[in-house]
Curated annotation (Swiss-Prot), chain A:
Belongs to the IRC6 family. The gene is IRC6. InterPro entries: Irc6. This is Increased recombination centers protein 6. Keywords: Chromosomal rearrangement. It comes from Vanderwaltozyma polyspora (strain ATCC 22028 / DSM 70294 / BCRC 21397 / CBS 2163 / NBRC 10782 / NRRL Y-8283 / UCD 57-17) (Kluyveromyces polysporus).
């Protein structure tokens, strides 16, 4: 909860601690969260007071940045009851690590499944930094039943490639990939609080606005405006009318 | 002839974004169908068949980007391929209405998506209107009436 009483959401992002971490941090924080290195200290562990904006809403959130040496250990810590409070306040988790297709794959899948199962109604993204895994393999992994371990709770991990080797913008399902997909997942996650921004409503193509009716209504509005004595009230009325007409004419 | 039993829209994250039931079922039965279908449909791979036998009926689904459109159909009456066309027409109509529709558009304008669906399918699940142009005209008329109503409210 913020000082003004509004709810502040939290996203946890965890990087594997290696010599690439500075580059990874910069690109993920820049591409996904639009955090410019010039304006934000990427070395901070908690970046507060950020705003996530879409064409429909704006919401405030804090970004928790973490690193790990051993994913298994980090995962087990986060699953443990000691971290119940932290998990409770999170809107979602993004893990940036290399996905392994070799013998320890099952353990990695198992860990992802375990973590996903304790993240009810929160998004969970695993960003794979392993260049050898193609987009088609990632799609298959995501389709694979073993990755949908937590579908009962309406939650599952989604693996997304960090590197866009093929330079594609969409996968075989016409779904966004890479950073854009991470943004899409965050866009549609369940935030707390937030407010809707004034939007231009979607509307079917049409040019046949009844102008006569618009003018009649304008006349009517002007007469009513002139009748209002209180200046503030008049201004308020004028503002409401202009908004309504703008929407009507779009 | 179509007699769709239900139409569900499920996201890749397993969230139900739209649900329309054309048969009367108790709530717990609906929840069970949604839960089972979510795990069945999400786990199917790209090259698998889009028609699945499910309990006493068939399910036809199609994936568009990160959204799965799932229809339960009456086996004796419905044609599976026609159902796929109904789904596609619904998606095309939403795409034209919203202009490259995405999940967020549906979340924040779900009533418009339901309006389009209601124009296409009658309350018994049969096809009422197949023309995209006609459906968009109807929805546009509803939008105009809604805006007029807002204006009237401000002016009154």
């Amino acid at each position: 909860m913020n000082e003004d009483g509004s709810v502040c959401n939290k996203i946890l992002i965890a990087f594997q601690d290696n010599d690439q971490i500075a580059n990874l941090k910069e690109s993920v924080l820049g591409e996904v969260f639009r955090l410019d290195k010039a304006n934000t200290n990427h070395d901070e562990n908690i970046i507060k007071g950020l705003t996530w904006s879409t064409k429909y809403y704006e919401v405030r959130y804090d970004l928790y940045v973490d690193t790990f040496d051993d994913f298994e250990e980090w995962c087990k810590d986060l699953i443990s009851s000691e971290y119940d409070d932290l998990r409770e306040v999170l809107s979602g988790i993004i893990v940036i690590d290399s996905y392994t297709m070799e013998k320890d794959k099952i353990d990695q899948n198992k860990l992802l499944g375990q973590l996903g199962s304790v993240l009810q109604d929160k998004f969970f993204v695993f960003m794979n930094t392993n260049k050898d895994i193609s987009q088609d393999v990632i799609d298959e992994l995501n389709d694979d039943n073993s990755m949908q371990l937590t579908s009962d709770s309406g939650n599952s991990v989604e693996i997304i490639n960090y590197h866009n080797v093929s330079n594609l913008k969409l996968n075989q399902y016409n779904e966004k990939i890479g950073f854009e997909r991470v943004r899409e997942i965050i866009d549609t996650c369940e935030w707390s609080g937030g407010h809707r921004v004034q939007t231009v409503e979607a509307k079917a193509d049409s040019t046949d606005v009844d102008l006569e009716s618009v003018f009649n209504r304008l006349k009517e509005a002007r007469l009513k405006y002139l009748e209002i004595e209180d200046e503030d009230e008049r201004e308020q009325f004028a503002l409401e009318i202009s908004n309504e007409f703008a929407e009507f004419l779009q | 002839m179509t007699q769709i039993k239900y139409m569900l829209l499920i996201s890749r994250q397993g969230k139900v974004r739209l649900q329309k039931w054309y048969v009367s079922l108790p709530n717990n039965e609906k929840t069970k169908i949604i839960r089972n279908l979510t795990s069945i449909v999400l786990s199917r791979k790209a090259k698998m068949c889009n028609i699945v036998e499910f309990g006493d009926h068939k399910v036809v689904y199609k994936r568009y980007a990160s959204l799965y459109f799932v229809c339960g159909i009456t086996q004796e009456v419905d044609n599976e391929l026609l159902t796929l066309e109904v789904i596609h027409r619904f998606v095309e109509t939403m795409d034209t209405y919203f202009g490259n529709v995405c999940e967020l558009d549906i979340i924040f304008n779900f009533e418009k998506a339901y309006n389009i669906l209601d124009d296409m399918l009658m309350c018994d699940g049969s096809l009422a209107e197949s023309s995209k142009k006609e459906i968009l005209n109807h929805v546009k008329t509803m939008d105009t009436m809604e805006h007029n109503d807002h204006l009237d409210r401000v002016l009154s």
